[in-house]
Amino acid sequence: MKIAILSRNSKLYSTRRLIEAGRTRGHTVRILDPLRCYMRIAADGFSLHYKGKPITGFDAVIPRIGASVTRYGTAVLRQFEFMGTYTPNPSDAILRSRDKLRAHQLLASQGIDMPVTVFGDNPDDTQDLLSMLGPPPHVVKLNEGAQGAGVILTEKASASRGVVEALRGLYANFIVQEFIGEAEGADLRCFVVGDRVVAAMRRQAADGDFRSNLHLGGTAAMAEASPQEQDVAVRSARALGLAVAGVDLIRSQRGPLVLEVNSTPGLEGVEGVCGVDVAGTIIQHLEQAIR
């Protein structure tokens, strides 16, 4: 099998592990920087070039597209799709996952529970908008933030109004959610490949923070996801059209709640903590998908 990995940095842990796993299983693996790909679009066919040469013959493409290059990276991935190349995470699925508002609408439509979420665009409606959510604390999130960036905890109604109105003044897109205090700054990252959870880790926020992202100083330990949590994680990935996903849940009094579905989850944390060959499992999924 000939596999392309769309990645801007071949030295990143996740990219290196996918290369290693693919080659270990006897496949040809090539790294392509999506920003150096260019394409021809016409009724008579689609084509891609890279560094002056046509890109042909790939059986599968694994997107490792960073948030900063989402628009062009997904355009390149879509070109691969139109050329008949399999991908576990299609371009439209990635776009769904990176729009928090759209993702939550899709999850809710499938009966998947999450922190209650509100969204609005009219500054005159701020107080009524927040009343739809309930009393603070509230969590304000930029709609396209990543790795914990653009996430603010407000503990008073006046603070919530102030943050919402400030973000509106900056023409920022954001959502506001209820704060789940019983989670105590912890979440559960479930790594989904295909139709199952292959690894799970519990992430704990650093002292003084409520965001559990490892990039922000959080810690992680191997965890066992309950059957209900596994079901929610798999259904969440499926609802967005993703075959490979990191689904972040919090444990609440009303059961598991989905915080986010990540379409480009890092492998270093989960492989290091859980000792699971996640990269190899992703390659096995490709093999099964294109038989």
Curated annotation (Swiss-Prot):
ATP binds at K141, E178, F179, D187, R211, S212, N213. Mg(2+) 2 binds at E260, N262. Residues 104-287 form the ATP-grasp domain. Binds 2 magnesium or manganese ions per subunit. Mn(2+) 2 binds at E260, N262. Coiled coil: none annotated. Mg(2+) 1 binds at D248, E260. Its cofactor is Mg(2+); Mn(2+). Pfam families: RimK, Rimk_N. GO terms for biological process: protein modification process; SOS response; translation. The keyword Ligase applies. Mn(2+) 1 binds at D248, E260. Its EC number is 6.3.2.-. One of its GO terms (molecular function) is ATP binding. Keywords: ATP-binding, Ligase, Magnesium, Manganese, Metal-binding, Nucleotide-binding, Protein biosynthesis. One of its GO terms (cellular component) is cytoplasm. Belongs to the RimK family. This is Probable alpha-L-glutamate ligase.
